[in-house]
């Protein structure tokens, strides 16, 4: 049986992982990893385990580890070496297993460490990305400064890089994807389908707790750095039309 591991940093990615398990990966063994980049992730993983959705579920203190690394030059050097050799990573249980495919979206350094370790277990591992909203359809491949050190050294050692192993891009609207990966359509979530039923058990879906009539789902660019896309001005205009008291962001 094919074994997949899906790394999730946001709730949107987690919902995609659930839908993938219920559709394209229905007859495959799927491990899901949910990180502390999202609040309450540890509790959600406990609930997911109780619902028996995936073969394995793990909580990963990824964000916490990243913050610790920023203050520890020795740890940074150690993990840089791990990106090159694939040895001695974070010590998570999922890092020591064999997988046929790794699916992710956020290309953080810690993801590259996990990739390097999984590659050692299976040099034929397939790497895929999945979408994080429409903006992600136009995502280019970002090469960090460390990649200019890591990638050539991996090639000298006869090891492929993360980008060289990439194949698929899982998304809801493949016709909109213009990147270099192979677009694979995730079936849309049906209102009365299995994924919707799971989500209603995982989360409180009652609308009674929200007095606002409209919800604005923002991206990260305007409030977490990167290139602003002007969302703040858009929100102001929407609020002027519908009223501040009717809008939750």
Please annotate each region the language model reported:
Residues 152, 234-237:
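Histidine/cysteine-enriched polar flanking segments
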Residues 74-77, 81-84, 192, 196, ...:
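A conditional alpha-helix N-cap/helix-loop micro-motif detector
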Residues 1-4, 97-99, 205-215, 219-220, ...:
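A short, charged/proline- and glycine-enriched loop
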Residues 240-249:
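Catalytic donor nucleotide-activated moiety binding site of glycosyltransferases and closely related
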Residues 21-23, 91-95, 200-210, 238-239:
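Short boundary motifs at domain starts and secondary-structure transition points
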Residues 5-171:
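Active-site and donor-binding regions of nucleotide-sugar-utilizing enzymes
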Residues 4-14, 222-232:
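Short, glycine-rich nucleotide/cofactor-binding loops
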Residues 132, 137-224:
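A nucleotide-sugar donor-handling region in carbohydrate enzymes
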